[in-house]
Amino acid sequence: MALDNHKFGDYSPYLYKTTNGGVKWKSITNGLPKNTLVWRLVQDHINPNLLFLATEYGVYVSLDQGDKWHKFSTGLPTISVRDMAIQKRENDLVLATFGRSFYILDDYSALRAISEESLEKEGILFQPRTALQYEPLIGGTSSQGASFFTSKNPEYGALIRFYIKDAFTSSKEKRLKREGLLKDGNVPFPGWTALDNEMLETTNEAVVVIRNSEGQIVDQLTKPL
């Protein structure tokens, strides 16, 4: 249950759960920063341990029924997420924000296989969904002109998802983090040499090797971390 008291100047997160029909309630705010107003709490329809939380500053996820929360806003601006809903057929998480439109997290089903213990592993390769083989159709806009709108389709082929514990952190990301910790806001100029090195820096890559049942390599994918 998510509650708020912001109309009285109280922005603390109030989040509770019960496992005995409301006889006893437990606060489940571990991992949430202070003054994080909570708006909506939803539970996965297959794994009851998986919870999603909409807050004034983005989305959080819990893998253990709220005992610990993790910020879950990669690719999502730090915005007020006022409501959430789960599209059960596709396992999509749909977000409604305050003034910043709607967002959809496509197929979060891989999160069901994660636990707090598994996050300590060096890496995890998730079971992929069944991939469909088809001929993509190149369509047109008919006579509707600019009023016709369709969003971009997912890329053709199987989607392979993996988790790496210690992801690569670029020099620019490290610098921005250091600058964000400066209390007085007086950020020194890093120097042209440092900025040039940031631009020329290459990122680490993950190499995924795909083999058939006989152990023969059939494909190799390279993705930046």
Predicted segments, located by residue:
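Beta-propeller blade termini and top-face loops
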Residues: 1-148, 155-156, 165-167
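Short, glycine-anchored, charge-dense loop/turn motifs used at functional sites
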Residues: 65, 212-216
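Contiguous beta-strand segments within globular domains
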Residues: 135-205
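Beta-strand signatures of extracellular beta-sandwich domains
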Residues: 207-211
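Glycine-centered tight-turn motifs at strand-turn-strand junctions
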Residues: 217-225
